[in-house]
Design a protein with these regions (language model features):
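Secretory targeting and sorting signals
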Residues: 1-23
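A structural motif
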Residues: 22-151
Length: 151
C-alpha cells in the first residue's frame, strides 16, 4: 500500500481529540530561532478559533496551534489545522488560506523541517489517536508533494 494511502487510512480512522494537543515544551508559545536555519513560532488558537496570517483569517481547531514559519530561502508561510482536522497553509500574496494536498487530517501542527539551500522543506503534523507525526515535503520546482509520510 502506498505511503499516501496508509496515511489517508490512518487519518480517516482517527477521531477528533479536542482536549488533546501535540506535546510542547511551552503551552503558550514555542519558538525556534537560529540565524542559519528555519525559524518558526506557534500561536495558540483562541476560543473563537479565528486567527489571521499575512492578513488572511482562518478558523482553526480549538486546542491547536497555528505555526508561522520564516523560511530561509522562500516566502514565509503559516500552517494550521481547521475545525474539520484538514491541514491548511497561507503565505504572502496567496489570496487566502489553501488546503494542503494529500487529504491529510491531523490534530495539531508539530514543527517545520529545515529548508535546504535548494528550497526543499517540510511541515510535520501530529495525530492524537495514534500519537504519530506525519510530514509533507516541498520539492522545488514542483511545490508541495501532496503526499504525507511518517515523520
Amino acid at each position: 500500500m502506498a505511503a499516501g494511502m496508509v496515511f489517508a487510512a490512518v487519518f480517516a480512522a482517527a477521531t477528533p481529540a479536542a482536549a488533546n494537543a501535540a506535546p510542547r515544551a511551552d503551552s503558550a508559545v514555542q519558538e525556534t530561532v537560529a540565524a542559519t536555519s528555519t525559524a518558526y513560532h506557534f500561536t495558540a488558537v483562541p476560543a473563537s478559533g479565528r486567527l489571521p496570517c499575512f492578513g488572511y483569517y482562518g478558523t482553526f481547531k480549538q486546542g491547536s496551534y497555528v505555526m508561522v514559519v520564516d523560511w530561509v530561502h522562500t516566502s514565509d508561510e503559516c500552517f494550521g489545522i481547521s475545525t474539520d482536522r484538514t491541514i491548511w497553509h497561507a503565505w504572502p500574496n496567496s489570496g487566502g488560506w489553501k488546503k494542503m494536498g494529500g487529504n491529510g487530517l491531523a490534530d495539531d501542527i508539530a514543527y517545520a523541517v529545515d529548508e535546504g539551500a535548494n528550497g526543499s522543506k517540510g511541515v510535520v503534523v501530529w495525530v492524537a489517536s495514534s500519537n504519530k507525526y506525519w510530514v509533507q515535503r516541498y520539492a522545488p520546482p514542483l511545490g508541495w508533494t501532496g503526499e504525507w509520510t511518517l515523520a
